[in-house]
Amino acid sequence: MTAATLAQLRVDNSFAALPAAFYTRLAPQPLTAPRLLHANEQAAALIGLSADALRSDEFLRVFSGQQPLPGGQTLAAVYSGHQFGVWAGQLGDGRAHLLGEVAGPDGNWELQLKGAGMTPYSRMGDGRAVLRSSVREYLASEAMHGLGIPTTRSLALVVSDDPVMRETVETAAIVTRMSPSFVRFGSFEHWSSRRQPDELRILADYVIDKFYPECREPRPGEAPGPDGALLRMLAEVTRRTAELMAGWQAVGFCHGVMNTDNMSILGLTLDYGPYGFMDAFRLDHICNHSDSEGRYAWNRQPSVALWNLYRLGGSLHALVPDVEALRAVLDSYEVIFTRAFHQRMAAKLGLREWRADDEPLLDDLLRLMHDNRADFTLTFRRLADAVRGRPQGLQDLFIDRDAALAWFERLAARHAQEGAGNDAQARAAGMDAVNPLYVLRNHLAEQAIRAAKAGDAGEIDTLLALLRDPCVEQPGRDAYAALPPDWAGGIEVSCSS
């Protein structure tokens, strides 16, 4: 099904059908003289929208906030949360407007404008997003999708000359995000903290019925009842979150702001702010300049996710009195994360299966990379060339070339232990298929931002083409797979957007 126009989309408003306390209905505040910088045909196909529709005047009007989505009900949602480990109280969509929910060929997608003006939840904010951060978010979601990591998606990027004050005066933009749902851990925390169990139950029922209907069915040996459905939902959220963290860690991705209000109830990567894909590897790499204590450093992300899950579990305690049952569900996190992470790392190292004694091999590689500031992405990518008998490129990434070669010889010996079918070329090809050559490095995003400021979306097009299939080498694109230039070291990203 491909709709010729926005008016032909099948629009639902399931979140708007919740009681009024869950949101505020309001219209966006349109940008002045908006211009469509980019529209994503792949994301549009998810809602059955044709390429021609993306070039229509109506498309620009809807996704610049000038008119509502046909059939939609625009609103901003309320939620609360912990920010940097501290209870922040009520938060909510301070600059995001949910336009509606569209039925696509393979499922429903909510469409949300980010940067579309103030809402009752803006607190001290101005409701706007700047071009810089909007380009970064637009690219990041598509990059993560290309890596096979669950994420929200990007549909459109609209820009304007409207001034926005941050550290300096910047210009405004609106990025349209797509997700099956924007419900967060903080959505549950909100009602729990306010001691409103009826609203908490309504939210839980909405999430279970719409996204986890299988949780209504007792598993073998379980007694039926509402507590069981909630526990099964929590178990599924725990599984998805653990597997998401394994995906982040395996590609060297740092989110930067893992507050509970930025954690998706569907296990998606949500809210791309001061994120980063690591260049020089540090176990304790901090991508967010605002994170002075390193709470959200790369090596802390899995434990922070569990901490956040405990906040979600604590919110559900108002509905599930059995604390031990909640704890038992959350205790499954570490096993799930470890298994998922090892599966990913086994594939990256060219191992057919992970063994318990492979842990020192991986730990020693990460420590060696840390000590030598070796590039994360290229280290894993060049392992395949070493398997092909060309270890020099791998060694070039390390100050201690001999140590790098010695470690690789340990990996080669481990490969040899796998016995029959130990074909080097086939193994190397398998490694190339999971170790990306292209990731959204900060300097590549910065180049796209600079071009976008001049009204040129060419770099966005180029990056999207590479990032959608990041493991496949493209001719003439060596610069996009190279080590970052010296000037990239001066790029700082923070919570200011």
UniProtKB/Swiss-Prot annotation:
Q: Which UniProt keywords apply?
A: ATP-binding, Magnesium, Manganese, Metal-binding, Nucleotide-binding, Nucleotidyltransferase, Transferase
Residues binding Mg(2+): 262, 271
Active-site residues are 261 (proton acceptor)
**Might you give the EC number(s) for this enzyme?**
2.7.7.-, 2.7.7.108
Q: Which InterPro entries match?
A: SelO
Pfam families, per database record: SelO
Q: Where are the transmembrane segments?
A: none
Where are the coiled-coil regions?
Answer: none
Q: What cofactor is this protein dependent on?
A: Mg(2+); Mn(2+)
Q: Molecular function (GO) terms listed?
A: AMPylase activity; ATP binding; magnesium ion binding
Known catalytic reactions: L-seryl-[protein] + ATP = 3-O-(5'-adenylyl)-L-seryl-[protein] + diphosphate; L-threonyl-[protein] + ATP = 3-O-(5'-adenylyl)-L-threonyl-[protein] + diphosphate; L-tyrosyl-[protein] + ATP = O-(5'-adenylyl)-L-tyrosyl-[protein] + diphosphate; L-histidyl-[protein] + UTP = N(tele)-(5'-uridylyl)-L-histidyl-[protein] + diphosphate
- Tell me the superkingdom of the source: Bacteria
Which parts of the sequence bind ATP?
92, 94-95, 114, 126-127, 177, 184, 271
Primary enzyme class: transferase
Biological role = Nucleotidyltransferase involved in the post-translational modification of proteins. It can catalyze the addition of adenosine monophosphate (AMP) or uridine monophosphate (UMP) to a protein, resulting in modifications known as AMPylation and UMPylation.
| Family under the similarity heading | Belongs to the SELO family.
Q: Which PANTHER family match?
A: PROTEIN ADENYLYLTRANSFERASE SELO, MITOCHONDRIAL (PTHR32057:SF14)
The protein in question is named Protein nucleotidyltransferase YdiU
Q: In which organism is this protein found?
A: Bordetella petrii (strain ATCC BAA-461 / DSM 12804 / CCUG 43448)
